[in-house]
């Protein structure tokens, strides 16, 4: 048998059913890997909780087989944005460094109720704001992939700990969150699968808020099939979340038919950047390869236009910053968060928020406060919301004549950890993922190959609302042609 840690979730499940190894043995191997990791992916480790869950899983495998699920006994990691009962949850911010919730987030509870084994909490950009996982009070995360010249690179963000842990074989799958690309972009840079479901498909209860109209839980796995299994366990209506969609959840794995003959694939001309920027040529070549794969399988390729794409990124950063400034107002050291004491209440607020929030979080709070201020609300926030509707309408009109959209996930490969990028260049990492987030559409990132620097490149499949099964199927075709790039 190949290295047990490198098995997919589906393969682990099959071997557990055959009793080739026990859930406890599987968990102990993962605990050892987590304890010896050099990626800084796990910030809180829960070996006792994991072993207890594994023992329960083994009992189910031997005595209660009727209660088995595809995730029973499977070791997973949880992004530190999701509340975990009696386990520290910090959003990787100093202001929450000692916060221990008294309840689980809905998606965490559903994952654990399905028998998954929690190995611990995963590193991330502070409050999910970032695309490199360098904005964490616990330090940056390393990508398991190293550039051909030996340079270490970022894992992407904000779910960088999740993507690095899965790609580094520290856990079989991980929970992440996606606001503007925070599941898909790190998955792309680490060469794994990352899926953001339709907004409302998964509950946000117990998920520390960044931008409430955009935040959505997602999954990161090493295969498309595994993504369908993890997603199945966390979806569903939740009365505790007013934005949760009360809509039936299909069996996603049954949608993976490995056939797309006759399906119409839209190729948006606005996503082609190689003519403007030479460094994007390699990504465009991989995009063309993916298009050919789908064409060879009988799909119809149709060029489409999403005319307001160029506005998506600035609109996103106005809206998400506005919502962040509102959501993070509660962390004042009195109601929530660590406090730096002072005899003067205004000075206490200033010290508490000034010292406990990181640079990127403070930047977005300031931008958000500015665009929501009385003199600029109409000029910025209100206008951004109007343009958001135009972006949504572009997708609505396109899906009248196509079934899926295929794009690159990121404009280029992962950059070096020590590379100093200006803020605008950093924000451009999300240029291909943000439009689907603004529209609330489901989207999946799947590896397409390696760059000349031996780093992963990926493609994104966007589907219509609640068609997670469909995008999983299209992604499976690309996966079939590409094969696993993780060794």
UniProtKB/Swiss-Prot annotation:
**EC category name:** ligase
Q: Which reaction does it catalyse?
A: L-glutamyl-tRNA(Gln) + L-glutamine + ATP + H2O = L-glutaminyl-tRNA(Gln) + L-glutamate + ADP + phosphate + H(+)
Q: Which InterPro entries match?
A: Amidase, Amidase_CS, Amidase_dom, AS_sf, GatA
- GO MF annotation: an example: ATP binding
Question: What is annotated as the active site?
Answer: 79, 158, 182
Q: Which GO terms describe its cellular component?
A: glutamyl-tRNA(Gln) amidotransferase complex
Q: Which Pfam families match?
A: Amidase
Query: Does this entry carry the keyword Ligase?
Result: yes
The record's EC number reads 6.3.5.7
Q: What's in the keyword line of the UniProt record?
A: ATP-binding, Ligase, Nucleotide-binding, Protein biosynthesis
For this protein, the record's SUPFAM superfamilies field holds: Amidase signature (AS) enzymes
Give the GO terms filed under biological process for this record. Answer: translation
Function noted in UniProt = Allows the formation of correctly charged Gln-tRNA(Gln) through the transamidation of misacylated Glu-tRNA(Gln) in organisms which lack glutaminyl-tRNA synthetase. The reaction takes place in the presence of glutamine and ATP through an activated gamma-phospho-Glu-tRNA(Gln).
User: Whom does it interact with, and what assembly results?
Assistant: Heterotrimer of A, B and C subunits.
Q: Which family does it belong to?
A: Belongs to the amidase family. GatA subfamily.
Name of the featured protein: Glutamyl-tRNA(Gln) amidotransferase subunit A
Q: Which organism is it from?
A: Ehrlichia chaffeensis (strain ATCC CRL-10679 / Arkansas)
Which gene name does the record give? Answer: gatA
